[in-house]
């Protein structure tokens, strides 16, 4: 700028200014010299030439300015740099002789008409002011409900945080103490991404709802985050226990770490029709207690996840009158799922490429009711297709289970009461195993199952297990 300070963005209506220091280009100590640099934008990729003039005799400091032209198309003959709002700008200069006598190409970049944000934010993020560039943590204060409009692009400076705050002092995060709704549409999504030259997973932290998680996220794409969304630490008091359902729908999470983390939250959740691809967990939910005055619903429907797994632990209402219900339905997962310490579970019409693990280590935390129906389970490694432990009442029906290299068990029931019917179980080491101990008597029904091509056993009953087995088709 005119004060010789580097700028991250040029305001609309301003001019580009370049400063170059190179004492080698001071070829005449008694005269003013000139050098040439090249300018490009994302709109005009063919370089415009800008002649820089030395600031005085024998200074080796060169300056030049160039005007912008806001246009959706480039023109190489107008002596203007054609730009659109949010364009990245680049200046390049070839130093004929660096400190080692070599020719070196040097580049610097800035942006045109980007809205910079850092610190407290109490206004909506609009498409008219997009794109936004967050240079430090942005905090939405309590009692404010903000919106991010459809079509907004939110960029983050990589691996830096000028606020030095939040969970990660070296990465930018959006911290929500009030409410935040991301309101993308199918035709006009919201984008969150790194602003780095070579963007990578973990360049920025994520969105973190804390204290009072009021907000929904729809039709957004997340790139380069450490953790897409965290809902955490809702105070267990009357003012928070009536939170509306939190909805995460129709989002795409790629080139990032983990997807959705939910901890210490008392609110209904709906996670629908999202796409996740990454090395972390698509959903991790733990230490969430149900409301003491109402039922509590956690829905996961219509999602595609190409991640590591889904973990849901302690989604439970410790009350005789109300319960937590977890529904996993119509999803396509290239992994398995693990659930423990909840009240009621329904897992229906999903595709898994990993096992379903349900239950807990003790009967006190056992799941009350389980329905597993209509799923396709294709194992990609040697573990159980369905494993239940300390489940009080379970129905497992109409599932297709295919093992991996004749290893482990298709359906394993430990200290659980289950009705297992009309399943097809093949290519495991054991088709169905049942076990319990003297202190936890159970009774399991095995009806009309097809148990074929398993390596060792069709049905294996051990310890104090008891079964009623009728009309099953069992053969190698």
Where are these regions (language model features)?
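Solvent-exposed, conformationally flexible loop/turn segments
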Residues: 11-13, 120
């Amino acid at each position: 700028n005119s004060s010789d300070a580097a700028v991250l963005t040029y305001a609309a209506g301003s001019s580009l200014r370049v400063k170059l220091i190179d004492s080698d280009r001071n070829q005449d100590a008694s005269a003013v010299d000139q050098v040439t640099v090249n300018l490009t934008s994302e709109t005009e990729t063919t370089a415009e030439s800008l002649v820089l003039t030395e600031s005085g005799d024998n200074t080796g400091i060169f300056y030049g300015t160039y005007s912008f032209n806001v246009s959706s198309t480039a023109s190489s003959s107008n002596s203007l740099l054609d730009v659109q709002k949010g364009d990245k700008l680049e200046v390049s200069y070839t130093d004929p002789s660096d400190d080692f006598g070599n020719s070196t190409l040097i580049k610097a970049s800035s942006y045109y008409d980007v809205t910079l944000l850092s610190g407290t934010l109490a206004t909506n993020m609009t498409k008219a002011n997009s794109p936004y560039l967050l240079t430090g943590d942005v905090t939405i204060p309590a009692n404010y409900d903000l919106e991010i409009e459809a079509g907004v692009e939110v960029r983050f400076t990589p691996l830096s945080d000028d606020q030095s705050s939040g969970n990660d002092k070296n990465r930018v995060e959006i911290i929500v103490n009030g409410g935040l709704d991301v309101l993308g549409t199918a035709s006009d999504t919201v984008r969150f991404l790194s602003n780095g030259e070579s963007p990578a997973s973990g360049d920025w932290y994520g969105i973190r709802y804390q204290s009072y998680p009021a907000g929904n996220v729809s039709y957004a794409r997340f790139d380069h985050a450490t953790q897409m969304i965290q809902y955490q630490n809702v105070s267990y008091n009357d003012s928070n226990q009536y939170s509306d359902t939190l909805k995460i729908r129709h989002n795409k999470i790629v080139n990032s770490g983990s997807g959705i983390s939910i901890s210490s939250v008392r609110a209904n959740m709906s996670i629908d029709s999202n796409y996740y691809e990454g090395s972390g967990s698509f959903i991790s939910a733990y230490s969430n207690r149900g409301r003491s005055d109402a039922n509590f619903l956690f829905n996961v429907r219509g999602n595609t996840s190409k991640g590591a797994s889904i973990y849901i632990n302690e989604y439970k209402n410790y009350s005789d009158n109300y319960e937590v219900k977890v529904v996993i339905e119509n999803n396509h997962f290239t992994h398995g799922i693990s659930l423990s310490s909840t009240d009621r579970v329904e897992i229906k019409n999903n595709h898994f490429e990993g096992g379903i693990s349900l239950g807990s280590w003790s009967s006190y935390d056992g799941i009350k009711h389980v329905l597993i129906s209509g799923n396709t389970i294709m194992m990609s490694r040697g573990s159980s297709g369905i494993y239940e432990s300390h489940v009080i009442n379970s129905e497992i029906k109409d599932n297709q289970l295919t093992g991996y290299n004749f290893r482990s068990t298709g359906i394993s029931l430990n200290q659980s009461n289950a009705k297992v019917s009309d399943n097809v179980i093949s290519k495991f080491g054991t088709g169905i195993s049942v076990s319990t101990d003297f202190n936890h008597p159970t009774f399991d029904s095995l009806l009309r199952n097809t148990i074929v091509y398993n390596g060792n056993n069709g049905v294996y009953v051990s310890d104090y297990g008891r079964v009623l087995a009728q009309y099953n088709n069992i053969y190698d």
